[in-house]
Amino acid sequence: MLRRAVLCLALAVTAGWAWAAEEEDNVLVLKSSNFAEELAAHKHLLVEFYAPWCGHCKALAPEYAKAAGKLKAEGSDIRLAKVDATEESDLAQQYGVRGYPTIKFFKNGDTASPKEYTAGREADDIVNWLKKRTGPAATTLADSAAAESLVESSEVAVIGFFKDVESDAAKQFLLAAEATDDIPFGLTASSDVFSRYQVHQDGVVLFKKFDEGRNNFEGEVTKEKLLDFIKHNQLPLVIEFTEQTAPKIFGGEIKTHILLFLPRSAADHDGKLSGFKQAAEGFKGKILFIFIDSDHADNQRILEFFGLKKEECPAVRLITLEEEMTKYKPESDELTAEGITEFCQRFLEGKIKPHLMSQELPEDWDRQPVKVLVGKNFEEVAFDEKKNVFVEFYAPWCGHCKQLAPIWDKLGETYKEHQDIVIAKMDSTANEVEAVKVHSFPTLKFFPAGPGRTVIDYNGERTLDGFKKFLESGGQDGAGDEDGLEDLEEAEEPDLEEDDDQKAVRDEL
């Protein structure tokens, strides 16, 4: 009897061990077998669904672990966890994982509606976002030690100094705090804290570990004005584009970005960056100044997007990220503070024309059944009033474009003797035209003969028969909206798209 009891106890303990989550660098490792138990055990749980091959996941890993360690050291009840979605496909499907990394926040074990994590990829961003979701919008600062701890805890922190924390201004401050995900806010009425930071009347101060160190808010305290003040001052004058900073860059409200492509190894690196920073001072809140290390392998796609080669750097380009992306190029290659300032000012005044990339026209562009278009000959060919022109806009790296290539070649062969039908293709990563905005690959458009510069989208089957029916119907059978096209970012190796936030970055760059 005793032996049976001991055996049962051993089995129970072993089973308990089997269900318990392991930890890696303070991050819980979750599986289907322990997911529900860990949700029940932790009131606040942030879960990353990742893939071992995902570059963005690898870049996030040290910051994610750092955030987990920081919260654990503070004695917080917030825990961080991760799930290998390639191994735990049922969990990934259950929680709608369509890209890597996908990060979801579970509160009180609620599996019905976990909140999507949308902030930055640095440890401070993660910690601040979680604290905003689990505590007050602003921490009450009773003394200087508490204030110093808050300021030291993050790259950027905001403190409201109000002698009456129930005042209308203080309430507006709290509304701004509630609307800001990724920055810690503190609220104080302590004369000790006022004195420590040399604040002599009610006000708001943004503290930061870069540039001028602090910014004092001036004017009437309203939620909208505070948010505008924070937007203008929370980022460095010049911010480097990295995996970690990308969400801050593209998640902000400033949609005009000027980019300095500069090799970190350049002899005049510091001087060029200093001039760029000097120019940035006059455009805070209007234009975001971004430095891109043109030597870094991860940034080569961005160079390609702007039609740049490494040997052409340093170089400056400007882009607007509204509904339609538009690029601009300085007339001069001189990268002085004065030259960059003048370029930005002329852009804001509407005096700069968009820059459209074009390859050189190949000598044999029209010798094959499928004609080769570049920016320089597009208008002449596509809008020839005597021709019906069917164009594939492709990217060399796009898997679906590669699959389409032999079919498109057969289509060219089929119509090579037709005098009024032209089958063509254009590499849209190296050529841009004002008449067509390409948002996905492959994009197929038909330019029928006749006046009026008509453009018809093709959204039918990507088969030879489908294309023939479309052409023989005069662009009717298969015409439609572009809702079936592949994403610009399109990952070729994985079954799932990579991380939505990073996809947006590449969509916009």
Curated annotation (Swiss-Prot):
The record marks R121 as: Lowers pKa of C-terminal Cys of first active site. Its EC number is 5.3.4.1. It is a peripheral membrane protein. It comes from the Eukaryota. The keyword Repeat applies. The keyword Metal-binding does not apply. It catalyses: Catalyzes the rearrangement of -S-S- bonds in proteins. InterPro entries: PDI_thioredoxin-like_dom, Prot_disulphide_isomerase, Thioredoxin-like_sf, Thioredoxin_CS, Thioredoxin_domain. The modification N6-succinyllysine is found at K223, K272. The record marks R462 as: Lowers pKa of C-terminal Cys of second active site. The record marks G55, H56, G399, H400 as: Contributes to redox potential value. Keywords: Cell membrane, Chaperone, Disulfide bond, Endoplasmic reticulum, Isomerase, Membrane, Phosphoprotein, Redox-active center, Repeat, Signal. GO terms for biological process: protein folding; response to endoplasmic reticulum stress. Heterodimer; heterodimerizes with the protein microsomal triglyceride transfer MTTP. Homodimer. Monomers and homotetramers may also occur. Interacts with P4HA2, forming a heterotetramer consisting of 2 alpha subunits (P4HA2) and 2 beta (P4HB), where P4HB plays the role of a structural subunit; this tetramer catalyzes the formation of 4-hydroxyproline in collagen. Also constitutes the structural subunit of the microsomal triacylglycerol transfer protein MTTP in mammalian cells. Stabilizes both enzymes and retain them in the ER without contributing to the catalytic activity. Binds UBQLN1. This is Protein disulfide-isomerase. It comes from Oryctolagus cuniculus.
